[in-house]
Regions:
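N-terminal membrane topogenic signal
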Residues: 1-13, 74-75
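Hydrophobic core segments of alpha-helical transmembrane domains in multi-pass membrane transport
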Residues: 13-26, 40-50, 82-89, 119-130, ...
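Short, hydrophobic transmembrane alpha-helix segments
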Residues: 23-35
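Membrane-interfacial loop-to-helix junctions in multi-pass transporters
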Residues: 33-35, 69-79, 106-115, 153-155, ...
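Structural signature of hydrophobic alpha-helical transmembrane segments
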Residues: 37-49, 106-118, 166-179
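Juxtamembrane transmembrane-helix boundary signature
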Residues: 44-62
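Flexible loop linkers connecting adjacent transmembrane helices
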Residues: 56-74, 99-103
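Helix-loop-helix junctions within the multi-pass membrane cores of secondary transporters/permeases
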Residues: 76-148
Length: 185
């Protein structure tokens, strides 16, 4: 619990510090608004602490078990379908992706969420197949980067500007513990 508190503080305190510096220097605000901000920041830290703790407690054991069972199955088609579905669903549940979708007015929310979730599903399949067949990472990158550049040249500009940022939001508190545990399993 203390470790999760430290993680939450590390994520939120810099932002709180910047906001407070701005409030006391160039953008003064009423005391009532400042107190609301401070209370909200404390609740945010506590909420993040419990959320990441719960996500890790739930996702890590589940991911390890699923990963173990997947590697024991001999049907590649089952592995492919399950990995895609797991990557897709776990990404849709990612809170950071929901926030990003709300921040991009030029792309409908569901379009962005589905596109990112599909990408994670596809690349989770690729990662699991790479592990199962012992394919070197360099070979995968030599194949996948040209595909990414070709796709980047044909998608709408509005979509492209958000595409690379979207990769960052998939490394949130839901996706990372699950996918890492899946790989360990």
């Amino acid at each position: 619990l203390l470790e999760k508190l430290k993680e939450s503080l590390g994520a939120v305190l810099p932002i709180i510090g910047i906001v407070l510096v701005l409030c006391f220097s160039i953008a003064p605000i009423p005391n009532s608004v400042l107190m609301t901000f401070v209370v909200g920041a404390v609740l945010l830290i506590i909420g993040m602490m419990f959320f990441t703790l719960g996500a890790e407690m739930a996702m890590t054991p589940m991911g390890e078990r699923i990963g173990t069972k997947l590697t024991n199955t001999r049907k590649i088609s089952v592995v492919i379908v399950l990995c895609f579905i797991l990557g897709f669903i776990i990404t849709i549940s990612e809170p950071d992706l929901q926030v990003l979708a709300e921040q991009v007015p030029s792309i409908p929310n569901y379009t962005l969420i589905i596109a990112v979730a599909t990408g994670v599903g596809i690349f989770l399949v690729a990662a699991v197949l790479r592990m199962l067949f012992g394919i070197p990472l360099a070979h995968m990158l030599l194949i996948l980067y040209p595909i990414i550049f070709i796709l980047a040249s044909i998608v709408p500009q509005d979509f492209l500007t958000v595409a690379f940022d979207s990769g960052g939001v998939t490394t949130g508190p839901m996706t990372v513990p699950f996918i890492m545990a899946l790989g360990i399993g």
